[in-house]
């Protein structure tokens, strides 16, 4: 007897034995069809399942026919909900009940999905929903699951090495925290498959590399955990330790999925302008990701370095252009290296990291999503993710995801780099009602030289042409209509006359 059938049979036996339940309530719990689920509940359930991207596991578990699987896949490619189509087929054509769906979720260990529909099944089945998060030691002995998570749900966060989400909540060393494999059906073998060519590092080595997680080696602290400087195998590394401080189980799952997302994509794409991931550790006290240490800090920090207590020299015009060029190359690689474009989703100065030679590398891959097959196509997603002030209006307002999202974000970065202003800065006093983009548009028409960073000598000759080319590219990248934005390849072609490497 299958796991689904076993759960149903046990529930039915318990219902028959329970004489205190009313006949009408028992009848509802056992026979309510999936198609009768209230629309808000169904919408929430589909959004959750789509975020986990588990429709293939669901289809496999119930043995849908190949043509039905193809039908679901086709709906997903059109930007529609794959989970909703699964429910249409399995719940509609075959008239399955909510209780059967609950049993299916139990079999695949989709515990949060079980919670979403628990009010529509017998209370006797509620005992199958785990009350607490399993610990690392419990999961190490747990069997593998065929369910997997391909893309974490689109919640905004800063999960890169820069760890720009500065949540100062503390945690103790003995606190029980979930590992990468403990939530969202991410098991050890799933993580290891995603990191096939990546080194799995012994936790004790990382503990030793950081002098026992010494506070002196801590580079930053955020909502997802802490980042430490370490010396491992004679390499200077940055080690991100996952603490998952949120008390909310759903939020813990989001954080875990984003960590898995980062592991999956940083391992599968290698480029000079994409942050190098050296290895991972999931069998010790806390899950860890190990990166190349970027000694130059973030672009955001360098752009504000003149305001620091120990100020650094302002980046030169040529350095600003080189950083912009390298970032553009990294984004172009993400968009074109695979059959399906990868959309970073959170391009901003805080996620552009610099090595000791000021060469840029894009970090924070927790929000990367696979986009539509074509570079100029659009897919509608369930939630907006990323840093909103860097996101285009069609994504913020209508959740329309395309490579144009990254292009727009890069355009804002270009304007920040060459004007020396942050997107959140107030523009000059007589222009207080204008944001950075509106201000640049106005000055571009009236007095272009006023736009340039004031902490540097005014550029001249070819250097001036280079700066104006970059600002103009920033304006084109931030066009309101995504169809008017250039591709990253077109941006690189604009930069070609000024490339010296």
UniProtKB/Swiss-Prot annotation:
GO terms for cellular component: cytoplasm; cytosol; nucleus; plasma membrane. One of its GO terms (biological process) is dorsal/ventral pattern formation. InterPro entries: CR_Ser/Thr_kinase, DEATH-like_dom_sf, Death_dom, Kinase-like_dom_sf, Pelle_death, Prot_kinase_dom, Protein_kinase_ATP_BS, Ser-Thr/Tyr_kinase_cat_dom. The keyword Aminoacyl-tRNA synthetase does not apply. SMART domains: DEATH, S_TKc. It is found in: Cell membrane; Cytoplasm. It is an enzyme of class 2 (transferase). Residues 55-121 form the Death domain. Its EC number is 2.7.11.1. Plays an essential role in the Tl receptor signaling pathway that establishes embryonic dorsoventral polarity; the signal directs import of dl into ventral and ventrolateral nuclei, thereby establishing dorsoventral polarity. Tub recruits pll to the plasma membrane and protein-protein interaction activates pll. This is Serine/threonine-protein kinase pelle.
């Amino acid at each position: 007897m299958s796991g689904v059938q076993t759960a149903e049979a046990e529930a039915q036996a318990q219902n028959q034995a329970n004489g205190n339940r009313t006949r009408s309530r028992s009848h509802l719990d056992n026979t309510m069809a999936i198609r009768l689920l209230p629309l808000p509940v169904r919408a929430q359930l589909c959004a959750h399942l789509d975020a986990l991207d588990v429709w293939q596991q669901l289809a496999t578990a119930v043995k849908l026919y190949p043509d039905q699987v193809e039908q679901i896949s086709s709906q997903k490619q059109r930007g529609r909900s794959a989970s909703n189509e699964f429910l249409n087929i399995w719940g509609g054509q075959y008239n399955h009940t909510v209780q059967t769906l609950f049993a299916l979720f139990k079999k695949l260990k989709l515990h949060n999905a079980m919670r979403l529909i628990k009010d529509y099944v017998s209370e006797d089945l509620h005992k199958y929903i785990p009350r607490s998060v399993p610990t690392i030691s419990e999961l190490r002995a747990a069997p593998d699951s065929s369910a997997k998570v391909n893309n974490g749900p689109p919640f905004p966060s800063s999960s890169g090495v820069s760890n720009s989400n500065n949540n100062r909540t503390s945690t103790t060393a003995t606190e029980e925290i979930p590992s990468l494999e403990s939530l969202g059906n991410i098991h050890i073998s799933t993580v290891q498959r995603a990191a096939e060519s990546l080194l799995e590092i012994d936790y004790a080595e990382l503990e030793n590399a950081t002098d026992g997680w010494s506070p002196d080696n801590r580079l930053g602290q955020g909502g997802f955990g802490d980042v430490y400087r370490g010396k491992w195998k004679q390499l200077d590394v940055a080690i991100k330790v996952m603490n998952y401080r949120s008390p909310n189980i759903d939020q813990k799952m989001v954080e875990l999925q984003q960590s898995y997302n980062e592991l999956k994509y940083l391992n599968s794409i290698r480029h000079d302008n994409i942050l190098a991931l050296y290895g991972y550790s999931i069998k010790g006290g806390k899950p860890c990701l190990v990166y190349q240490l970027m000694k130059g800090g973030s672009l955001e920090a360098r752009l504000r370095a003149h305001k620091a207590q120990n100020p650094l020299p302002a980046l030169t015009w040529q350095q600003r252009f080189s950083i912009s060029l390298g970032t553009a190359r990294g984004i172009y690689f993400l968009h074109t290296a695979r059959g399906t474009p990868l959309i970073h989703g959170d391009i901003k100065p805080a996620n552009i990291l610099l090595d000791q030679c000021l060469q840029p590398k894009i970090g924070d891959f927790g929000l990367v999503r696979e986009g539509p097959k074509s570079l100029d196509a659009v897919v509608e997603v369930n939630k907006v993710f990323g840093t909103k002030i860097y996101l285009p209006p069609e994504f913020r307002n209508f959740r329309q995801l395309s490579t144009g999202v990254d292009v727009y974000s890069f355009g804002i970065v270009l304007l920040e780099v060459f004007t020396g202003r942050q997107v959140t800065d107030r523009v000059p006093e007589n222009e207080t009602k204008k944001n950075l983009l509106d201000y640049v548009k106005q000055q571009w028409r009236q007095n272009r030289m006023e736009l340039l960073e004031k902490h540097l000598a005014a550029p001249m000759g070819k250097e001036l042409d280079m700066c104006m080319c970059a600002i103009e590219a920033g304006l084109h990248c931030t066009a309101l209509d995504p169809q008017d934005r250039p591709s990253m390849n077109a941006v690189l072609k604009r930069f070609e006359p000024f490339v010296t490497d």
